[in-house]
């Protein structure tokens, strides 16, 4: 089973036990995270595409590490002016391990219990 998740303004295709590097998320190593912005869920050639997200689909993950990316150098030079400027930047990143992909019904079960309790209270 695979899913396409959206986090940090980017899209990632993930499967169970994948380890991916994404934009920084709050948390320390060992924390559990749930991604709810799921764009697509599928098994093999069979896939469910959301509009824009798949209702009730949840991807569970665990934070493995917090770190920083390789340094990116921004260099500006003005020719014949003996003027140059160099600046470096390192983006913060989070490494996560995908634990489980729950298709439609992963989080909806909790909501359906509330609606059942509300229906019983109304009767």
Curated annotation (Swiss-Prot):
Keywords: Ribonucleoprotein, Ribosomal protein, RNA-binding, rRNA-binding. One of its GO terms (cellular component) is ribonucleoprotein complex. GO terms for molecular function: rRNA binding; structural constituent of ribosome. The keyword Ribonucleoprotein applies. One of its GO terms (biological process) is translation. InterPro entries: bL21-like, bL21-like_sf, Ribosomal_bL21. It comes from the Bacteria. Pfam families: Ribosomal_L21p (PF00829). This protein binds to 23S rRNA in the presence of protein L20. NCBIfam families: L21 (TIGR00061). Part of the 50S ribosomal subunit. Contacts protein L20. PANTHER family: 50S RIBOSOMAL PROTEIN L21, LARGE RIBOSOMAL SUBUNIT PROTEIN BL21M. Belongs to the bacterial ribosomal protein bL21 family. This is Large ribosomal subunit protein bL21. It comes from Sinorhizobium fredii (strain NBRC 101917 / NGR234). The gene is rplU.
């Amino acid at each position: 089973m695979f899913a396409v998740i959206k986090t940090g303004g980017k899209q990632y295709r993930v499967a169970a036990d994948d380890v991916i590097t994404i934009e920084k998320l709050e948390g320390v190593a060992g924390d559990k995270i749930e991604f709810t912005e799921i764009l697509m869920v599928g098994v093999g050639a069979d896939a469910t595409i959301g509009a824009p997200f798949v209702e009730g689909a949840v991807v569970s993950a665990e934070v493995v590490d917090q770190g920083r990316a390789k340094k990116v150098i921004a260099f500006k030079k003005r020719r014949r002016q003996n003027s140059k400027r160099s600046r470096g930047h390192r983006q913060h990143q989070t490494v996560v391990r995908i634990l489980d992909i729950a298709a439609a019904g992963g989080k909806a079960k909790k909501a359906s219990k509330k609606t059942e309790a509300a229906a019983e209270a109304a009767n």
